[in-house]
């Protein structure tokens, strides 16, 4: 690699789709001679059970890259190359050398570009019409946007529990303000744009309601990975998983490093809402 690039300080998100697809071409096929994606995942810190769960993925290399990037603050390009070297896949590094360098250079160039707004402008206030007037209490003139204590990530099948959550946290002495998409967001806008705006700019934290249906939801998958990318390593305690009923499927591996608020344990149910409210009330 070029000596002008400090790859140990460039995050994994600098690598674009083309490089990730080519990594999959090298690592996805099971190989009795050369190390494959399983060896890479093990060196990334994934457990045996987590790696076994990835076996069902069509592109396990893509999944481990995404999940490693979301859960590990040390997920840098340099670290990935070091892992490939440790598992004796120097052939992969050599073949993708130019593409990786190009992606990293483009990433640095984007980072060095001047911001679109001048310093005097508060970047917390949305400036495009698409990000104005997206919730019930938003100022239609584009003034101060409506803010929330937490964004609730949930599936439609879990809406009864979300309704109870709103009663327990909003209509009691806790007086928290939750962002429930079906209740608070106005129709007619791009779902992905609005969701990212709410999670990043409008909500201090995100509560993830875990269930079997959650694991099959593309929307929940996007929301969770987006929130994790904003706080790698959970340094800001931004994301709080909640389990309120028993599951047949394995708990999502991407959230296993976070403390869970578990409603399924009868012995702790009386403390459940107080603990959740306190976590959402932190600065």
Curated annotation (Swiss-Prot):
Residues 101-142 are annotated as: Intermediate domain. GO terms for molecular function: TIR domain binding; Toll-like receptor binding; transcription factor binding. GO terms for cellular component: microtubule organizing center; nucleus; perinuclear region of cytoplasm; plasma membrane. SMART domains: DEATH (SM00005), TIR (SM00255). Residues 22-100 form the Death domain. GO terms for biological process: defense response to Gram-positive bacterium; inflammatory response; innate immune response; MyD88-dependent toll-like receptor signaling pathway; negative regulation of gene expression; positive regulation of canonical NF-kappaB signal transduction; positive regulation of gene expression; Toll signaling pathway. Disulfide bonds: none annotated. Keywords: Cytoplasm, Immunity, Inflammatory response, Innate immunity. Residues 146-280 form the TIR domain. It is found in: Cytoplasm. It comes from the Eukaryota. Its main location: cytoplasm. Adapter protein involved in the Toll-like receptor and IL-1 receptor signaling pathway in the innate immune response. The intermediate domain (ID) is required for the phosphorylation and activation of IRAK. This is Myeloid differentiation primary response protein MyD88.
